[in-house]
Amino acid sequence: MCELLAMSCRHPARLTSSLTALAAHADGDSRNRDGWGLAFYQGRDVALYRDTTPADTCPLVPWLEANGPATTLSLGYIRHATQGAINLANTGPFARELNGRMQVFAHNGNLKNLVHSSPINSGCFQPVGETDSALAFCLLLDRIRQLPHARGQLPSLQARLDTVAEVALALRALGPASFLYADSDVLFVHADRRRQPLTGQVTAPALYRLECPAGREPLLVRDCESEEAATAQRVILLASVPLTQEAWIPMREGEVLAIRQGEIIATVQL
């Protein structure tokens, strides 16, 4: 299965060796060598980097580690192709505009019957590639699009969270459906199941989180603001597997989080 990574923080920071740590899960005999992507939010827009080469051999990965933009919200992805050819159209994270903001989505799992599922309707959004992940993103966006909102504004947090949870519940019935979804304001996280490397079984946990309160910076993040801002920094990292020896917390199957600027602001348990 694919590898997921996300960072949410109060003040702009750089992922530094988080990129290398994520790429380490795509080297050697790993199956995850079918492409990678990184998204760095800059306000309502996003700087998106994707490639179809293995992350551990692509020269762009260490370049981004040293020169990538500082941000308060970032998503990362390494692909193991279960559906669709190895090409850019099938490589996440996927990005679309909605409500005047770039929306970004990355998924870990295999939704085998998604395209044939009658309740699934992606509406006016259509995937560019052939993956289940891109189709899942389109149907989520179509549901978000229908929520009440003022022109150019986001729907309420509760409405968005409820919709993310409803879509996650529908996807889980079709297969493992862990995903990261960001709308420039909030990072939504759904933890499901994944194939465990030691047992080969598809079980939880599929995601881990690392919470670093004010004044404690994680090893994989470098603060890019003043020393005063660094003392008030607050960071949450999400990853498919623990990337350091720090106190990563396994997420429960069916757990949905809404995270803003390094703080969990809402939760749902499916």
Language-model features, listed with the residues they occupy:
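Catalytic core of PPM/PP2C metal-dependent serine/threonine phosphatase domains
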Residues: L73, A150-R193
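A conserved acidic, glycine/proline-rich C-terminal tail/linker
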Residues: P205-E255
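Short acidic (Asp/Glu) patches
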Residues: T52-L64, I78-R101, S117-G123
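Glycine-rich phosphate/ribose-binding loops and adjacent secondary-structure elements
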Residues: L111, A182, G254
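Helix-loop elements that line ligand-binding/catalytic pockets
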Residues: D185-R216
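Conserved beta-strand-loop-short alpha-helix elements that form
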Residues: C2, Q103-N113
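Extreme N-terminus nucleophile/cap motif
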Residues: M1-C58, G254-A258, E263-Q269
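Glycine-rich phosphate-binding loop plus the immediately following alpha-helix
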Residues: L114-V115, C124-L147
